[in-house]
C-alpha cells in the first residue's frame, strides 16, 4: 500500500490530498492495473476516453496530429502522467494521440463515475482538475494555427504547451512536407538557430525540429 500511496501522491489530480484520503481511495476504489511491453499500444487516437488512465511506471511515447495534419508532435511521457486528462468530458472525448509504451510500462485506471465522485467529495481534487482545464482554456486556440501577429517563438511555445504533457521530453515536431521555416514564419530561421546554440532544440532537417524538454522551451525567452 505504501508504494501505491507514493505513486498516487505524484499523480497531478491527487497533488496536495491528505494521506488518509489517498489511502481510502486506494482501498475502496475499483482500480484496474495493466502492464504493457515495449512497443505495445496503450491507447489510439480516436478511441473514446472512458476512464482516467494514469502512468505509474515506464515511459510512454505519444504522437498527435495538429494544424489540420500539417504537423505531427511526438513526446516522451514520464510516470505519474494522466493520459488525455482534458478529454474525459465535453464534446470531444476521444484520445487526441496514439500512446505507445517505450519500455515495460504500468498503468492504473478508474472510471469516470469514480472521478466525478472524487470531484464532489474532495476540494483538492476538484481544484487540481479545474486548474488544469483553466490553463488549457487560457491558451488561445488561435495559437495552434498560423497567425501573422504571433512571433515564431510564441507560436512554437503555444504549440508545445497545448500539444504535450507537463514534464515530457524528447519532443519532435515534424511537418508533412513543408519546411518548418515556412510554417512558423520568416523569423523562425533565426529562432531555430538561437535554440540550437542554447541546446534547447535542434533543427534535424527542413521538416523536423527536436526539442530536448518541454520546460526548457517554455522557459526560453526570445
Role assignments for model-derived ranges:
Residues 40-102:
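Cyclic nucleotide-binding regulatory domains
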Amino acid at each position: 500500500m505504501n508504494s501505491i500511496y507514493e505513486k498516487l501522491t505524484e499523480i497531478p489530480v491527487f497533488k496536495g490530498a491528505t494521506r488518509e484520503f489517498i489511502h481510502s481511495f486506494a482501498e475502496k476504489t475499483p482500480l484496474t492495473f495493466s502492464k504493457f511491453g515495449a512497443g505495445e499500444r496503450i491507447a489510439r487516437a480516436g478511441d473514446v476516453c472512458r476512464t482516467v488512465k494514469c502512468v505509474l511506471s515506464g515511459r510512454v511515447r505519444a504522437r498527435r496530429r495538429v494544424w489540420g495534419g500539417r504537423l505531427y508532435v511526438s513526446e516522451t511521457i514520464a510516470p505519474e502522467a494522466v493520459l488525455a486528462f482534458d478529454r474525459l468530458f465535453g464534446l470531444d472525448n476521444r484520445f487526441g494521440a496514439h500512446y505507445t509504451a517505450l519500455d515495460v510500462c504500468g498503468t492504473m485506471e478508474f472510471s469516470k463515475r469514480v472521478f466525478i465522485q472524487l470531484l464532489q467529495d474532495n476540494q483538492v481534487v476538484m481544484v487540481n482538475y479545474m486548474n488544469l482545464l483553466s490553463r488549457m482554456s487560457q491558451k488561445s486556440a488561435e495559437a495552434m494555427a498560423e497567425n501573422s501577429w504571433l512571433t515564431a517563438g510564441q507560436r512554437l511555445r503555444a504549440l508545445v504547451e497545448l500539444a504535450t504533457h507537463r514534464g515530457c521530453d524528447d519532443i519532435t515536431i515534424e511537418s508533412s512536407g513543408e519546411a518548418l521555416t515556412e510554417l512558423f514564419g520568416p523569423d523562425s530561421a533565426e529562432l531555430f538557430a538561437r535554440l540550437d546554440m542554447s541546446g534547447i532544440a535542434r533543427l534535424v532537417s527542413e521538416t523536423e525540429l527536436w526539442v530536448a524538454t518541454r520546460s526548457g522551451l517554455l522557459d526560453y525567452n526570445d
